[in-house]
């Protein structure tokens, strides 16, 4: 980020140890505390982590955390993220840490990865929908996106993907009911493609925003995929 100067960052670092492989990361304490409430609370001076400037996150993934660190310093997700499951992992990590802007950037990246202009659009796989349902709650933006994606697949999806769709509804408890309710909420109108931002789905349709957010969505500003649905 252009505004990250040595004065603003300070010179105090914290050590974060990730995953069973114990990969170490050293980041500026001021920056990571300003990124999300989870790390702000953890590195508050009253707690052990704040006193020792050290934290162990044994259940998190080192690749995902490295992407988080890169995003934290640069202000955008690294280019070339094309694996939907990896992006789903990033979203879930951001949800855990309540890094709202990272969540929104990950959602943009997921839409773009599934709507790849070079090698063609993709649907969510059975394993991806299963993982989303296992790690989200009702109303979470990522689950709503998965439901919207399945709803679109029912009407407009590739006939060759029917087996994947049926297996998803069989394996993911409650997913079919969620999708049918979602379709009913459209009131008879055709379901829109949720991979496309800037038409019947607003650019921020699957973002999280609060009343305290900036007037302009940073994730939307950083997005390059603003296409209209005609």
Descriptions of predicted regions:
Residues 36, 99, 169-173:
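Short, solvent-exposed helix-helix connector turns and helix-capping sites enriched
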Residues 56, 63, 67-161:
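Post-BTB helical module
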Residues 24, 49-56, 91:
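Short interface patches used for recognition in eukaryotic signaling and trafficking proteins
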Residues 28-40:
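Short helix-loop-helix/strand-helix junction enriched in hydrophobic and basic residues
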């Amino acid at each position: 980020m252009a505004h990250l100067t040595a004065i603003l960052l300070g010179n105090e670092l914290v050590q974060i140890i990730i995953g069973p492989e114990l990969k170490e990361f050293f980041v500026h304490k001021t920056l990571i505390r300003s990124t999300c409430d989870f790390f702000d609370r953890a590195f508050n001076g009253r707690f052990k982590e704040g006193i020792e400037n050290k934290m162990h996150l044994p259940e998190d993934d080192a690749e995902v955390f490295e992407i988080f660190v890169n995003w934290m310093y640069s202000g955008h997700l690294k280019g070339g993220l094309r694996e939907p499951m990896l992006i789903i992992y990033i979203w879930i990590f951001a949800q855990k840490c309540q890094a709202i802007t990272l969540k929104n950037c990950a959602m943009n990246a997921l839409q773009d990865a599934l709507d790849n202009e070079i090698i063609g659009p993709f649907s969510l796989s059975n394993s991806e929908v299963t993982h989303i349902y296992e790690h989200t709650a009702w109303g979470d933006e990522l689950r709503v996106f998965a439901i919207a994606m399945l709803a679109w697949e029912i009407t407009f999806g590739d006939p060759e993907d029917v087996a994947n769709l049926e297996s998803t509804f069989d394996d993911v408890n409650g997913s079919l009911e969620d999708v049918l309710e979602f379709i009913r909420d459209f009131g008879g109108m055709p379901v829109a493609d949720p991979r496309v931002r800037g038409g019947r789905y607003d650019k921020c349709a699957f973002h999280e925003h609060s009343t305290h957010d900036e007037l302009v969505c940073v994730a939307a500003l950083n997005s390059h995929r603003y296409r209209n649905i005609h």
